[in-house]
Amino acid sequence: MLKLFNVNFNNMPERKLDEIFSLREITFKDRLDWKVTCIDGKESDQYDDENTNYILGTIDDTIVCSVRFIDMKYPTMITGPFAPYFSDVSLPIDGFIESSRFFVEKALARDMVGNNSSLSTILFLAMVNYARDRGHKGILTVVSRGMFILLKRSGWNITVLNQGESEKNEVIYLLHLGIDNDSQQQLINKILRVHQVEPKTLETWPIIVPGIIK
C-alpha cells in the first residue's frame, strides 16, 4: 500500500527527517551532482524549517518519494538562490507555494513497486491534491530541462514564467504548476492506464493507493 500525506517540519520525527535528508543526498548529490551541502550523508539547507511542509510517499513506512513546499510569503529558493538566474519576472505570491527537492528514490521504487509504477505521476497528483486541499492558488517551481519534459508528458497544465541558465550552464525553467480540475484529471487518467485503482481514491487528500506493490 502506497500512502501519500503531508507533515510539517516541526512535527516530523527525527528519524524521518534523517531518512528524507539521506535520500535527498542520494538523489541530488550522488545522482544529479547538484551543488548542495551534505553533512554525514544527509542533504539539507536553510529552507528546511518551521515554514516547510513535506509530502511523503511511503510503502510499509519506508519513504519512496517526497517533495518540499514553502508558502511564497516566506523566503524560498525562487526568491533566494534561484533569483539571479531569471530576469524581469513578476511572481504571484498570494496563495502560491513553492515546490522543491522533488524526488522518487528509483532503487527503492523499483524494488518495491516495479519499473512501471507511475510513481512520479502519483507524486505529481499528490502535489495537486495537497494544494487544492489547503486552498492554494497554484504551485511555483524551478526545474531542469529533463524535469520539464517529464512534467509536460504527464498531462499537467504548466506555464513557463521564465527561462534561465544555471551555474552548470544548463537551461532551467521557472514554472507555474496548475491545480485546476483538468490537471487533476489528466494525472489521474495517466495513473489509471497503469494501475487498477478506484478513481475516487485518487481525488482525495491524503492519498492511499492499495495494491501498488509487486
Swiss-Prot record:
Molecular function in Gene Ontology: N-acyl homoserine lactone synthase activity
One Gene Ontology biological process: signal transduction
Gene field: yenI
Enzyme Commission number, as recorded: 2.3.1.184
Stated family: Belongs to the autoinducer synthase family.
Name of protein: Acyl-homoserine-lactone synthase
Keyword S-adenosyl-L-methionine attached: yes
Function: Required for the synthesis of autoinducer molecules such as OHHL (N-(3-oxohexanoyl)-L-homoserine lactone), and HHL (N-hexanoyl-L-homoserine lactone).
